[in-house]
Amino acid sequence: MTATIPPLTPTVTPSNPDRPIADLKLQDIIKTLPKECFEKKASKAWASVLITLGAIAVGYLGIIYLPWYCLPITWIWTGTALTGAFVVGHDCGHRSFAKKRWVNDLVGHIAFAPLIYPFHSWRLLHDHHHLHTNKIEVDNAWDPWSVEAFQASPAIVRLFYRAIRGPFWWTGSIFHWSLMHFKLSNFAQRDRNKVKLSIAVVFLFAAIAFPALIITTGVWGFVKFWLMPWLVYHFWMSTFTIVHHTIPEIRFRPAADWSAAEAQLNGTVHCDYPRWVEVLCHDINVHIPHHLSVAIPSYNLRLAHGSLKENWGPFLYERTFNWQLMQQISGQCHLYDPEHGYRTFGSLKKV
């Protein structure tokens, strides 16, 4: 049962009618969520681990025993299941998986290791994203470039940006992973020992697992058992994250004009995917409540989203994953003008 609180009570008078929630505090929205949304349940948390382990096992059994022409299907399944492992680690990074920090850190490192994702590196960068969602030149996740920044960049950089913002959006997380998570200068001095530990963990995993895989199954085995599922994982990682924050209606604001309540409620997208994807990926697509409070475990996101629809429905962006959506995102959402919103690369030729 939710406590219904009108989005704009008589005591809240918006200073800008075009931005009716910009004057609200984030806590005003969070207070409307049922308390049950924030309850951690070990049984549900570990059930998500078992679902992921079972799905990964099924995928690898398929890769091993099904005919070669079934490989694309088994790669898609296994890569999607590995995305579920990332989501388990994602909850650990937000401390919403377990009550004890050491459990979160241990499970997070184990979940991220096969993906070669350094846990603390990701956790710290992701925390920054949550603190500065849709804040121009501060957010670090799919923050669109300005026209000036794009035109001032070297040609090779512009080429890569065009690719990632266009037809190769599905590689975006690979670039983000490789360029951001292993560079110590991206982290405060106080956090660098933790970052070094996480980097050491994934290097150790790679140093043991990759040679063992190649020795026992050959280079093709490395491609078949690790590389292809890993690429499918990055397809989902890139797709989920770009859809979370990239449709033409989403607004990015400079720091002086930024509102946490507006950014987290009205600057994030809920997207429905095929149900099997949502199950294997533990509802990572139910993203709006997660941005309002990272304390909500993944298994409570749907409850929270239902409450948001009841209380804040007009301010929510909801979409369905399909080819038309991805064409819209990759075809229109290229560069950003704070006054007019997204611009396409093609619009530069008309100026």
From Swiss-Prot:
Ranges spanned by the short sequence motif Histidine box-1, renumbered to the chain: 90-94
Phosphoprotein listed as a keyword: no
Organism for this UniProt entry: Synechocystis sp. (strain ATCC 27184 / PCC 6803 / Kazusa)
GO MF term list: acyl-CoA (9+3)-desaturase activity; oxidoreductase activity
Transmembrane parts of this sequence: 46-66, 68-88, 102-122, 199-219, 222-242
Cofactors demanded by this protein: Fe(2+)
GO CC annotations, alphabetized: membrane
Disruption phenotype: The disruption mutant loses the ability to desaturate fatty acids at the carbon 12 position. The growth rate of the desA-desD double mutant, which lacks polyunsaturated molecular species of membrane lipids, is dramatically lower at 20 and 25 degrees Celsius than that of the wild-type strain.
Annotated protein name in UniProt: sn-1 oleoyl-lipid 12-desaturase
Family matches, as Pfam families: FA_desaturase (PF00487)
Domain comment as written in the entry: The histidine box domains are involved in binding the catalytic metal ions.
Location, primary (coarse class): membrane
